[in-house]
Amino acid sequence: MNCCDFSHSRRRLVLGAGGSFCAAFLAGTSAAADTPEDRLRELLTDRRSLKLLRGDEQLEATYWTANGGYNRDQYLNICWLLRDMQADRVFPMNHGLLDVLCGVQTWLARTGIDAPLRIHSGYRTSKTNQRTEGAALDSRHIVGRAVDISVTGVSNVRLAGMASVLGRGGTGLYPGRNFVHVDTGNERIWIDRPRKKA
């Protein structure tokens, strides 16, 4: 399968933003990984860990292992870091979302980038979401199924592309802003163009 020959328009949108980025973006996964589930399965090892950074807080946590399943304490540590910081509220984050983040981080590591995912936003209460500029009223942030992330030294286009082809939900690319939105749910992608001032 040609790396740019995706049947879904959502993938074409992200890849179209990058041109020659396509080959580099798919480096680190095998040619046999043709479907999003295949790609994610290939990237998720017997030990699923996340390296996260949010402000002054840093966390490296192994939330799942093949022989032990989910590690409750490490999972709760991740949920704490992804809390609504304005409301100081913690919420159980979606396991599938953590797997997508782990897949992206593993993929980056296989291409020589060993950097934490910088968290810009995780869980949001409805009140915080209402105060967040441009947030959808039914945002997946309010149900623990979305994060906004960036990685030092990685373009947002590349990061969005990686999250998109893992196929677990939505990916939002915001040109001119410093993060990529990743969520679990319906597969879709959007590029939010900066609004012109009148």
Predicted regions and their residues:
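N-terminal secretory signal peptides and thylakoid transit peptides that target proteins
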Residues: M1-A24
